[in-house]
Every structure is written in C-alpha cells, then in structure tokens.
Amino acid sequence: MGNSRAYPVFRTTDATAAYTQAMRLCALLAECEDEVGLMAELETVEDLRKMAAVLPGATFHYVGVRTGSNGHSGWFDLDVATTEDVVLEAHLPLYTLEDAARGSAEERFVAALGQGTAAIGWHGLWPDDPEADQYGIAKYDGVQVVFHGDDAQWGRWTEHHTVFVHVDKWGDLPRAEKLAAHIGGEVLGEEQLGW
C-alpha cells in the first residue's frame, strides 16, 4: 500500500527537451510496462481535436463537476470529430486520462500539447544496486513528465515542464540523485507524493 515518492530531476520550458530527458531515464529502467499513462487537460477546441486525433476512442471528461438540468452530474458524450466548434467550446475545459501501448502515441501526444497541464507516466522497475542497498520495486518505480506543471499530482499550472523519477514509498534520495546525474541534472526539490 502507499504511493511512490517522486523527485523532480529536470525542468525546462521546452516540452520536447523534457520528453527527451524522460526517455533517457526510461532507458535506465530494468523493466518498463507495456502501457504508458497519458493525461491532458484541453482548454481550446483546437487542442481537443488534436488530442482526439492522437488518441482515437479516448474518453473526455469535464474538469470539475458539472450538474445537468436534472440535478445529476453531467457527462461529456459528444463526438469530438463531428461536433461543431461552437458546441464544443461550451463544454471546455475537458481532460482525458488514457493508457496506450508504449511507443504508440507519446511523440504525437507531445506534439499535440496545448496550454493545459498534461503528463506521461512510464511505470517500470529500477535495476537493483546491492552495493548501494537499493532494490527496485515495480509498484513504485518509474518516470513521469508533467507538462505545464511542477507537481507530480498535476497541481497548479506553470510555464515549465518537469521530469520526475518515482521510487519506493519510503523515498530514495540517493537513487534519485544518481538518476538525475545520468541526465546531467540534480534533484530540484523535495520529494513529492507520487502514484
């Protein structure tokens, strides 16, 4: 039980650079799951249509609770491809949270990013390092890049993008420092609650 601890190890205003550094860290994983988690908040119709093209069949949800005329929670169920812009505009902002086969959508996802917060998460397993008494734990280990944010839990919006390494629930600053050094960086702040 519990959540991983996420350490910020790279920050930039260049989304492609953040993605590239995240991929360099993913290459260090002893194992990487076959699926990646993709999350994006969409604030414009253009952004919504771009993301729908990248993630065909994705489900979109309202950001925040919306109540219909019957007093029940509203659901977004319009076809993004065929609905007129003016109708979609009234439903924004929306978000999507999807899993995709690793390697199938990440680059197109980054290219389609708008100004909303977004994230890609790769779950995996860091290699064991018995000399340092560090052992990977698949439930917690991985890499995450948060676009327009500096919070592993997708908190407040920022201009920059942040790459996190996730380690076990007790934290592992020495491992995070080693991983950061691999990409020419350093741990940029306190550990955060991860996934």
Explain the meaning of each model-derived region.
Residues M1-W195:
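Structured alpha/beta or helical-core interaction and ligand-binding surfaces enriched in interleaved
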